[in-house]
């Protein structure tokens, strides 16, 4: 398991855009499973939506991307680099994520060639799918 200090050694994201709290499983170059504890104290809930707080879908996808970046950037050849979005395909949102939810983020890398990685991503809350997507990463 990686705590927030160890995550920050792998990916460059910082508050307020660091969207994963811990990594529970890591197989470098293959898979990462992370957690995000969604709290009402996050500034974004003041406007999304007042009286009906919902985590924006784009931030769920970003949290998945950060999880995938941990899996990629844990490889020795990518240490110290940055993983950028190369593409988002087939993103589907199936469940609303609210404050108090614990978001489980899982990314399985299916292909890595040169500086490009492809992965399947799934976010769940209480075992129910909240978001699925196919992500492309560019390593720079």
From Swiss-Prot:
InterPro entries: FabA_FabZ, FabZ, HotDog_dom_sf. Its EC number is 4.2.1.59. The active site is at residue 48. GO terms for cellular component: cytoplasm; membrane. The keyword Lyase applies. Keywords: Cytoplasm, Lipid A biosynthesis, Lipid biosynthesis, Lipid metabolism, Lyase. Its main location: cytoplasm. It is an enzyme of class 4 (lyase). GO terms for molecular function: (3R)-hydroxyacyl-[acyl-carrier-protein] dehydratase activity. PANTHER family: 3-HYDROXYACYL-[ACYL-CARRIER-PROTEIN] DEHYDRATASE (PTHR30272:SF1). This is 3-hydroxyacyl-[acyl-carrier-protein] dehydratase FabZ. It comes from Ligilactobacillus salivarius (strain UCC118). The lineage of its organism: Bacteria, Bacillati, Bacillota, Bacilli, Lactobacillales.
């Amino acid at each position: 398991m990686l705590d927030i200090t160890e995550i920050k050694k792998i990916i460059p994201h910082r508050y307020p855009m660091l969207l994963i709290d811990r990594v529970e499983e890591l197989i470098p170059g293959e898979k990462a499973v992370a957690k995000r504890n969604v709290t009402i104290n996050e500034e974004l809930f003041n406007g999304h939506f007042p009286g009906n707080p919902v985590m924006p879908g784009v931030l769920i996808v970003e949290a998945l991307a950060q999880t995938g970046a941990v899996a990629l950037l844990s490889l020795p050849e990518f240490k110290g680099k940055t993983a950028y979005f190369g593409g988002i395909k087939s993103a589907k949102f199936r469940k609303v994520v609210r404050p108090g939810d614990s978001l489980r983020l899982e990314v399985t890398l299916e292909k890595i060639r040169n500086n490009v990685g492809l992965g399947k991503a799934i976010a769940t809350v209480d075992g129910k799918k909240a978001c699925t997507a196919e992500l492309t990463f560019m390593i720079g």
